[in-house]
């Protein structure tokens, strides 16, 4: 699959948490480095995401969001 985004990180899905409208996906791209993405439930179902599966975290500079816990 080709993508225009240059920041692509292959990794392993650690967790998939489905909410009312949004699914949060945690992808470990290196030991101890985890990206969390919020996607629609429909997208998560289409991608058939599951813990232990392989996925890419794709980051576009114009689409980076910042949050704190």
What residue ranges belong to the model's regions?
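Non-catalytic connector elements of ABC transporters
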Residues: 1-69
